[in-house]
């Protein structure tokens, strides 16, 4: 079986050595080169054409952000960013994902993370997963935005209620998918949007802030007890489950720190299943790119107990990881499976 060929780019000799050891200890992975800065790394990527690259965010000479941009322009390969848990690190990481990185790994204790082995299983898992992703150059990705998409199917299902709520679940590749969907929704959209994106604490705030700066709608990290408003998207904070509950005639956010569900907190299952208790609302659920099957069980509960749900899933054509959508499709829970570019217009169509 062919090994996954990886390049490790980090300015710390200690981090290069330990990350290389972590990867080389997996029989499925071979580290073919290491690099101490972005410029050296770019040259080795062009020379060796690896299957995947791990890239530190903060480096001298050419930092991780500049290196990522050059790699995606000149020799696109899947990139996994390594980031610190600081606010600046989170902001840079979200920017990197938006600029083409496939995923990120959080260093437990800063740039030189002596306890990096605490996340060694995550490093191997994400590197192997990233190696299967087909990445596009920056030019290809921007051109794709303007390509025509397949005709959206006509839905022969009338709205049962006057009010609606949109819910979205996503994981790997989610920040870029959310950017595509949310930036195409109009400011006056007649529904609140609740979102679970698998992400650690700190990073969801940076994601919400970035999306808010480029979307017509408002985007914010959800706060416990706040009343949902149309035209606003609420992203579950990392480390908290998010549910929706009735408060009088309104809907409100409920956050809790109950144990992770199947390894996830926030959990898409938890969000979707909470919607079965919301009466007199049309519900539009979307499952976007992501690894695993989070969302399927919750959607099943929702559809068993609520007849006013329309379910969408991102197709394999555009999903960076076709795991979560595929699980829901295979369970027979999805009404419409479509490319990412078709989803915003269908959401709007269902709300008008």
Swiss-Prot record:
UniProt-listed InterPro entries: CheB-like (IPR008248), CheB_C (IPR035909), CheY-like_superfamily (IPR011006), Sig_transdc_resp-reg_Me-estase (IPR000673), Sig_transdc_resp-reg_receiver (IPR001789)
Name the UniProt record assigns to this protein: Protein-glutamate methylesterase/protein-glutamine glutaminase
Reaction(s) catalysed by this chain's protein: [protein]-L-glutamate 5-O-methyl ester + H2O = L-glutamyl-[protein] + methanol + H(+); L-glutaminyl-[protein] + H2O = L-glutamyl-[protein] + NH4(+)
Lineage: Bacteria, Bacillati, Bacillota, Bacilli, Bacillales
Predominant location category: cytoplasm
Top-rank EC class of the record's enzyme: hydrolase
Keyword field: Chemotaxis, Cytoplasm, Hydrolase, Phosphoprotein
Subcellular location: Cytoplasm
Free-text note on domains in this protein's UniProt record: Contains a C-terminal catalytic domain, and an N-terminal region which modulates catalytic activity.
The CheB-type methylesterase domain, residue ranges: 163-352
Originating gene: cheB
Residue numbers carrying 4-aspartylphosphate: 56
Post-translational modification comment from the UniProt entry: Phosphorylated by CheA. Phosphorylation of the N-terminal regulatory domain activates the methylesterase activity.
Species for this entry: Oceanobacillus iheyensis (strain DSM 14371 / CIP 107618 / JCM 11309 / KCTC 3954 / HTE831)
GO function terms (MF aspect): phosphorelay response regulator activity; protein-glutamate methylesterase activity; protein-glutamine glutaminase activity
Positions of the catalytic residues: 171, 198, 294
Family: Belongs to the CheB family.
Keyword Phosphoprotein attributed: yes
Physiological role: Involved in chemotaxis. Part of a chemotaxis signal transduction system that modulates chemotaxis in response to various stimuli. Catalyzes the demethylation of specific methylglutamate residues introduced into the chemoreceptors (methyl-accepting chemotaxis proteins or MCP) by CheR. Also mediates the irreversible deamidation of specific glutamine residues to glutamic acid.
One annotated GO biological process: chemotaxis
SUPFAM superfamilies on file: CheY-like, Methylesterase CheB, C-terminal domain
Enzyme Commission number: 3.1.1.61, 3.5.1.44
One GO CC annotation: cytoplasm
Domain Response regulatory: from-to ranges: 5-122
